[in-house]
Regions:
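Mixed-charge (Asp/Glu-Lys/Arg
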Residues: 1-46, 52-157
């Protein structure tokens, strides 16, 4: 592991769960506000859902999750129901100086393909879920959702 990678791993490992959640919500809120959106943060510190009002007045929901490479993030299908105004934002803590951010429209799960997963969990104790594999091998497929400066702005007009 390079010194730079170790420094980043150490930096992220010092953050508590609530600090990780807050970091992700702050990063995503700043990006949305830079597009002219109004963002209403949840009252609960552990709730990653942001209520957004676009410059045109359209309402949207963004489910934010801060994760490390190698993980798996999921939302129950009961909570994340695909709709044109519903998104997930992944703040990925990797080797870079700043976290990578990905924005996935919830409608992508209507025909999920890797790294997106659609699990019904029939006969299991877990609820049906939509998820995203964050394994290193899945990252190239996740690139299509990368939220860089200028990209994804059309989602929030």
């Amino acid at each position: 592991m390079s010194t730079s990678s170790k420094r980043q791993d150490d930096r992220w490992s010092q953050l508590s769960r609530s600090e990780l959640i807050a970091l992700g919500k702050r990063i995503v809120s700043e990006r949305l506000e830079s597009l002219g959106c109004t963002v209403e943060a949840p009252t609960s510190l552990s709730d990653g859902r942001l209520h957004v009002r676009t410059p045109s007045g359209r309402a949207a929901e963004v489910f934010v999750s801060t994760q490390r490479v190698g993980g798996y993030v999921f939302w129950t299908k009961r909570r994340l129901q695909p709709a044109d105004d519903r998104f997930t934002a992944i703040v990925l803590l990797a080797d870079a100086d700043e976290p990578d951010v990905y924005l996935v429209p919830s409608t992508e799960w209507l025909s999920a393909s890797p790294p997106l997963t659609d699990r019904d969990n029939v006969g299991k104790r877990s609820e049906p879920e939509f998820g995203i594999s964050l394994a290193r091998s899945s990252l190239p497929a996740l690139e299509r959702y990368r939220w860089d400066e200028g990209s994804r702005a059309d989602q929030f007009r």
